[in-house]
């Protein structure tokens, strides 16, 4: 059964501006420590990377029904990939606790990007 659903669309140029203005401070606030280690250093590639992650985290926060609030931080929502490149969502801290309170036993993440935008879709499901 679906217990949460979220989607988000991010303009990549917005992330370019954010990085130009705030640099590493933005990465520290928005990314999990492992994501920061994976983030490319080239500005255009970093903005695309950040846009995909930001869209995924916003979609996850919407699926949780909280947004980025109530103790849930961007760094609590980590995006990684399996060996085949499938995106994975890892929940930490308050995000994990909130998902458990919803009865979520699994989650699915889809991410896509084109020249100007990144899009993410998250489904939280329970075994009931």
Swiss-Prot record:
The keyword Cell membrane does not apply. It catalyses: apo-[ACP] + CoA = holo-[ACP] + adenosine 3',5'-bisphosphate + H(+). It is an enzyme of class 2 (transferase). Mg(2+) binds at residues 8, 58. The keyword Transferase applies. Pfam families: ACPS. Transfers the 4'-phosphopantetheine moiety from coenzyme A to a Ser of acyl-carrier-protein. This is Holo-[acyl-carrier-protein] synthase.
């Amino acid at each position: 059964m679906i217990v949460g659903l979220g989607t988000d669309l991010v303009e990549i140029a917005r992330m370019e501006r954010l990085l130009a203005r705030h640099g590493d401070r933005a990465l520290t606030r928005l990314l999990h420590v492992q994501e920061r280690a994976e983030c490319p250093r080239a500005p255009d590639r970093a903005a695309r990377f950040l846009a995909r992650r930001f869209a995924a985290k916003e979609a996850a926060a919407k699926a949780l029904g909280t947004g980025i609030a109530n103790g849930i931080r961007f760094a609590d929502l980590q995006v990684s990939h399996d060996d085949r490149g499938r995106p994975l969502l890892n929940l930490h801290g308050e995000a994990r606790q909130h998902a458990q309170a919803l009865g979520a036993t699994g989650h699915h993440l889809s991410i896509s990007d084109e020249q100007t935008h990144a899009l993410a879709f998250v489904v939280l499901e329970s075994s009931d």
